[in-house]
C-alpha cells in the first residue's frame, strides 16, 4: 500500500527576515534620492534618456545607497538602541545578526559598484563609491560624533545623487549637475536640524553633538531660518544659468516662500510639534522642487 505523502511547504523564505533587511536600506530615503538621480539624468540630455544607463544607473545607485544605509545601521546600532526614534530598528532588536548585516551591506555595495562600473561608466561608479564612503564612514562613523557641524560638512555626500544621475548618462562632470548638488547641500541642514530639535533629548542622551544640544534650540532655529533663505537663493541657480524656465521659477519661488515661512513660524511662533512640521515640509519641498525641474525640462 502506497504511503500517503504529506507535502510540507518550504518555509525558508517565509522565515527569512527580508523586511528587516529592506528596512536597513532605508527605502523611503532611497526613493526620494532616486527621484533626484532621475532628474539629474533627464536634465543632462535634451531628449529621452537611453534605456541602459537609465535602468542600470538607477539600480546601481539604489543598491549602493541601500548599502550605505545598512552601514549606517551597523555603525549606529549601539546608540540606535538607546534612542526613542530608532530603538526598534532591526539590529538593536536582534532581528538581524551583526555579521549578516555586514555581509548584506558589503554584497549590496559590491553589486551596485559592479553594475555601475560595467553597465554605466567608471566615473559614476567611483563617484557613487565616494558618496557611500562619505556618508557611511566620514559622516556616520566620525563627523556625527565629532562636531555640531556634522550635517553641514557631511551633507555633501547626501547631496551627490543628481550629479550621479548626470554622469550616468553623459560620462561627464558638468557644472549644471553641480548646481543640483548645491541645492540639496543647502537643503540638508534645515531639514535635519528641525528633526534634531524634536529629538534633542535623544541626541543628548547618546552624546551626539547635534546643534540643538551644543548651541541650544533658539540658536538652531535661527540657523534653520537663515539656511532656508540660502536655499531659496540656491534654488534660483538653474534659472540663472538657463537650465530651467518660468514654470520652475514660479514653483520654486512658492516652495521657498513656504519653507521660509515655516522656519519663521518655528523661530517666532512655535507651537507643539512645529519642528516636525518643518521637517515634513522640507521633504515635500525637495520632492516637489525636483518634480518641477523635471516637468519644466520637458515642456
From Swiss-Prot:
It catalyses: heme b + (2E,6E)-farnesyl diphosphate + H2O = Fe(II)-heme o + diphosphate. InterPro entries: Protohaem_IX_farnesylTrfase, UbiA_prenyltransferase, UbiA_prenylTrfase_CS, UbiA_sf. Keywords: Cell inner membrane, Cell membrane, Heme biosynthesis, Membrane, Transferase, Transmembrane, Transmembrane helix. It is found in: Cell inner membrane. GO terms for molecular function: protoheme IX farnesyltransferase activity. GO terms for cellular component: plasma membrane. Its main location: membrane. Carbon 2 of the heme B porphyrin ring is defined according to the Fischer nomenclature. This is Protoheme IX farnesyltransferase. The gene is cyoE.
Amino acid at each position: 500500500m502506497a504511503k500517503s505523502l504529506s507535502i510540507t511547504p518550504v518555509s525558508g523564505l517565509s522565515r527569512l527576515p527580508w523586511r528587516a533587511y529592506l528596512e536597513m536600506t532605508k527605502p523611503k530615503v532611497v526613493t526620494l534620492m532616486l527621484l533626484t538621480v532621475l532628474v539629474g539624468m533627464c536634465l543632462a540630455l535634451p531628449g529621452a534618456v537611453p534605456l541602459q544607463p537609465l535602468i542600470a544607473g538607477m539600480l546601481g545607485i539604489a543598491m549602493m545607497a541601500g548599502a550605505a544605509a545598512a552601514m549606517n545601521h551597523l555603525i549606529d546600532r549601539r546608540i540606535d538602541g538607546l534612542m526613542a526614534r530608532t530603538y526598534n530598528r532591526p539590529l538593536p532588536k536582534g532581528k538581524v545578526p551583526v555579521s549578516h548585516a555586514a555581509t548584506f551591506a558589503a554584497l549590496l555595495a559590491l553589486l551596485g559598484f559592479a553594475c555601475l562600473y560595467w553597465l554605466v561608466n567608471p566615473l559614476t561608479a567611483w563617484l557613487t563609491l565616494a558618496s557611500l564612503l562619505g556618508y557611511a564612514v566620514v559622516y556616520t562613523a566620525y563627523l556625527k560624533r565629532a562636531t555640531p557641524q556634522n550635517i553641514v560638512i557631511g551633507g555633501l555626500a547626501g547631496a551627490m545623487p543628481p550629479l550621479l544621475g548626470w554622469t550616468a548618462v553623459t560620462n561627464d562632470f558638468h557644472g549644471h549637475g553641480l548646481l543640483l548638488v548645491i541645492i540639496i547641500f543647502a537643503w540638508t541642514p534645515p531639514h535635519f536640524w528641525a528633526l534634531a530639535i524634536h529629538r534633542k533629548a535623544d541626541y543628548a542622551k547618546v552624546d551626539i553633538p547635534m546643534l540643538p544640544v551644543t548651541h541650544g534650540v533658539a540658536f538652531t532655529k535661527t540657523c534653520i531660518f537663515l539656511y532656508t533663505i540660502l536655499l531659496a537663493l540656491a534654488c534660483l541657480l538653474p534659472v540663472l544659468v538657463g537650465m530651467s524656465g518660468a514654470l520652475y521659477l514660479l514653483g520654486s519661488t512658492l516652495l521657498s516662500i513656504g519653507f521660509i515661512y515655516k522656519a519663521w513660524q518655528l523661530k517666532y511662533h512655535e507651537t507643539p510639534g512645529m519642528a516636525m512640521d518643518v521637517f515634513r515640509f522640507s521633504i515635500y519641498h525637495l520632492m516637489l522642487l525636483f518634480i518641477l525641474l523635471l516637468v519644466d525640462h520637458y515642456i
